[in-house]
């Protein structure tokens, strides 16, 4: 897409600096996965600091930036000076709307060659190792790669440009969306959906407008995913499941989540968008983690615990309750309330 064409899709954008006109804008980037000749969105200081920490890399990759106009107007002058090193800058009074509007043409571009209707084996475009086992009634999309010893059971759908590693077992009726990468020695149980659209919308003029996702999912080696769990694709960069992680049945993992190595997510737990779970975190049954939360390595959430949006918990935390707090503190609070209620009851 040409730079000036951005205005066709998002007319509220205003260019404030154009040091260099890129030949073409190739994609929208996430700040933790910058792509060459792409654009990023900056809505607040948290995102700004991420970009400024990698400003030299952003300049070399010819990254352009669209910022929230009010945030830019209030920005410190020294930050503006740093941003002016980039090829181009723009602002908009409705950043979420601009992101939504621009996500669609880049989604259309990425999906233009994704044929979800024809089995890639008929087209001769798949790369399936002779040592893989493919059951009946399996759909394998174009450009799918399946490694030696992998077993794909009946009823599974693997959409184009996805990869299945060696010795991975995919049980019946699993759905794997495009641009999903699953490592070796994994076990994916029946009913799992990997790579479905993230739950992202912008409300404008009475409608919920869809944010079109292109990030895909990466599942590393030796991961087990229980039946009827769902892992959403990232918005512009992958949702990531770390090596050796174990996911129980009926678990929801939202877009842009990054789960470390050796984590355990028990049944009906839920992880909201852009959460980071470091290595060996444990979520008890029905535990829930709010968006943009960061939970340190080795932390444990008791069953039913609810961690609020944007919380940061250090390594080794043990949490319980809603809103989540230190487990011992929560238990003491529950005991105190029980004692108070018993005393009141005894007065009746």
Language model features with spans:
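Structural signal for interior beta-strand "rungs" in well-ordered beta-sheet cores
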Residues: 41, 120-326
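Terminal amphipathic alpha-helical/low-complexity segments used for targeting or macromolecular assembly
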Residues: 1-124, 180, 185, 191-192, ...
